[in-house]
A protein has these predicted regions:
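Active-site region of glycoside hydrolase catalytic domains
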Residues: 2-123, 134-154
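Residues that cap or flank secondary-structure elements
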Residues: 39, 127-128, 160
């Protein structure tokens, strides 16, 4: 923080990237009584305090605060926005790779209402993704907590047809 304290407000810091125990949100965090969530919330507070204490432009720089694993669903049960000496300068950071079987595992290579049912993830693909954004809005944005999606997307696809679904996603 000290190295960049004199850089303008075009620079935003984010505390961490995808902090988790190796289980990507499906590990010990599920049954440790909230210990990992509490630890990350404490680290986020320490991050805000350290950046603010360095002075200069950092006194009111916008800071990105990640939830556990930057996962929208996990954040609903665990995220605590740190206290801050600057007003309205913290943003929640989330990532979205839903549905996993399409975006990262690539076990399904088509997505959406026009996809071949045997080649897409079951369910209402567009509706399921819309619900992710609704969760973000209802639980954070509507309550005055700004959110940015630091990562969103899916792995590359091999065929022209699969690439068309990737673009649609």
């Amino acid at each position: 923080a000290d190295k960049f304290k004199d850089k303008g407000d075009f620079l935003i810091f984010e505390a961490f990237n995808e902090i988790h125990d190796g289980g990507w949100g499906w590990g010990a965090n599920r049954n440790d009584g909230g210990k990992q969530y509490k630890c990350l919330n404490e680290w986020n507070q320490a991050f805000v305090d350290a950046v603010r204490a360095s002075g200069g432009e950092n006194a009111d720089r916008i800071l990105g605060i990640p939830a556990y694993c930057t996962n929208v669903d996990i954040s609903l049960e665990s995220f605590v926005m740190p206290e801050d000496t600057a007003n309205d300068r913290l943003m929640m950071s989330v990532h979205c790779y839903d549905p996993y079987d399409y975006t990262l595992a690539a076990t399904k290579n088509e997505w959406g209402h026009t996809a071949d049912a045997s080649k897409k993830v079951a369910g209402d693909n567009e509706g399921d993704l819309k619900r992710v954004f609704e969760k973000i809005y209802v639980n954070y944005i509507s309550k005055g907590i700004p959110v940015y999606m630091g990562e969103f997307g899916c792995v590359n696809r091999a065929t022209v047809r699969e690439q068309a679904f990737q673009q649609y996603y």
